[in-house]
């Protein structure tokens, strides 16, 4: 029975963080489009460095910490509301706020195909990592596995954005993804043991790129 539950958890995690899950993540670049326009990301190597920095020290790290906290607090509505409010406050730009809130809303709407009381415990609108953390926690998915899948999905989407922006080809994009595997695993382990005191970032250029994207005249992405 334990193996059956573990397999069920794996299948659900794979479904929820698959590119095919209907949340619209393909529409967002998280400021990468502006970074490319400004010459900060020009090839596969700089794309890998940009993404890796965000995962370890930027917005993706903060999302991982928030996911871990909502995973732990999935049975506590009041605590979930507090963490959800914090996640909104940490959005560093209008587009970043729009991105995380719309992804969270879409994730919850799609995940309701797997009924659970967690949907009643969550606020009506929550940021994406809060939604993923609470739902995976409610379904008994181990936090480290949820975090690894979440971060891998983030990196995959960022690599896809880089390919669409022309800074890497398909083969180079796959090499970037493969090269970041160990980093993803290390950050997932670190985030699983994190607390809210571990929130923080050191990615000023990425934050500025996200802000500058709001006034970019020609663009493919919403952020």
From Swiss-Prot:
One Pfam family, short name: UreF
Gene3D superfamilies: Urease accessory protein UreF (1.10.4190.10)
Domain of life: Bacteria
Chaperone listed as a keyword: yes
Subcellular location: Cytoplasm
Ranges annotated as spanning the membrane: none
GO molecular function: nickel cation binding
UniProt main location, coarse: cytoplasm
Disulfide bonds: none
UniProtKB keywords: Chaperone, Cytoplasm, Nickel insertion
GO CC term (a single one): cytoplasm
Function as written in the Swiss-Prot or TrEMBL entry: Required for maturation of urease via the functional incorporation of the urease nickel metallocenter.
Homology family: Belongs to the UreF family.
Quaternary structure (record): UreD, UreF and UreG form a complex that acts as a GTP-hydrolysis-dependent molecular chaperone, activating the urease apoprotein by helping to assemble the nickel containing metallocenter of UreC. The UreE protein probably delivers the nickel.
HAMAP family per the UniProt record, alphabetical: UreF
Protein name: Urease accessory protein UreF
Organism: Rhizobium leguminosarum bv. viciae
Gene: ureF
């Amino acid at each position: 029975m334990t193996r059956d539950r573990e397999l069920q958890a794996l299948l659900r995690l794979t479904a929820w963080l698959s590119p095919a899950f209907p949340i619209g993540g393909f529409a967002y670049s998280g400021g990468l489009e502006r970074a490319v326009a400004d010459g900060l990301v020009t090839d596969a190597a700089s794309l890998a460095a940009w993404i890796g920095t965000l995962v370890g020290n930027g917005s993706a790290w903060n999302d991982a910490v928030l996911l871990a906290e909502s995973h732990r607090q999935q049975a506590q509505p009041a605590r979930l509301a507090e963490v959800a409010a914090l996640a909104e406050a940490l959005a560093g730009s209008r587009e970043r706020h729009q991105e995380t809130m719309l992804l969270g809303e879409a994730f919850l709407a799609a995940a309701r195909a797997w009924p659970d009381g967690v949907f009643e415990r969550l606020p009506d609108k929550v940021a994406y990592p809060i939604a993923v953390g609470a739902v995976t926690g409610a379904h008994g998915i181990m936090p480290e596995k949820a975090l690894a899948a979440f971060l891998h999905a983030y990196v995959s989407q960022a690599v896809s954005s880089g390919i669409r922006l022309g800074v890497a080809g398909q083969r180079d994009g796959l090499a970037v993804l493969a090269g970041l595997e160990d980093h993803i695993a290390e950050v997932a382990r670190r985030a699983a043991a994190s607390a809210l005191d571990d929130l923080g970032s050191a990615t000023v250029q990425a934050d500025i790129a996200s802000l500058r994207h709001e006034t970019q005249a020609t663009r493919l992405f919403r952020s």
